[in-house]
């Protein structure tokens, strides 16, 4: 089973709010998920990112692959270090 760390959209139309979740790659964007790792609110200024760093690192150690957007959010929040090279 391929596991991804990705964004699940919530909130009203035109007012997005995202949960950072660990889910099977085959499940729908807003469908079933295995674990919730954090939240992302792009509407606040500056954008609000809350991540449970311990949970995120645990899932990354287990082999979960973050999507590009989640990888950027994890770097901003300090969970992932910048890769040089």
UniProtKB/Swiss-Prot annotation:
GO terms for molecular function: structural constituent of ribosome. HAMAP family: Ribosomal_bS16 (MF_00385). The keyword Ribosomal protein applies. This is Small ribosomal subunit protein bS16. Belongs to the bacterial ribosomal protein bS16 family. The keyword Nucleotide-binding does not apply. It comes from the Bacteria. InterPro entries: Ribosomal_bS16, Ribosomal_bS16_CS, Ribosomal_bS16_dom_sf. One of its GO terms (cellular component) is cytoplasm. One of its GO terms (biological process) is translation. Transmembrane segments: none annotated. PANTHER family: 30S RIBOSOMAL PROTEIN S16 (PTHR12919), SMALL RIBOSOMAL SUBUNIT PROTEIN BS16M (PTHR12919:SF20). The gene is rpsP. SUPFAM superfamilies: Ribosomal protein S16 (SSF54565). Keywords: Ribonucleoprotein, Ribosomal protein. PROSITE patterns: RIBOSOMAL_S16.
């Amino acid at each position: 089973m391929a596991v991804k760390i990705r964004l699940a959209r919530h909130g009203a139309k035109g007012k997005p709010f995202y949960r950072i979740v660990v889910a099977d790659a085959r499940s729908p964007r807003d469908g079933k998920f295995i674990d919730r790792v954090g939240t992302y609110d792009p509407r606040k200024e500056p954008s609000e990112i809350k991540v449970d760093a311990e949970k995120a690192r645990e899932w990354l150690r287990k082999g979960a692959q973050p999507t590009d957007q989640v990888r950027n959010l994890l770097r901003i929040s300090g969970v992932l270090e910048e890769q040089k090279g």
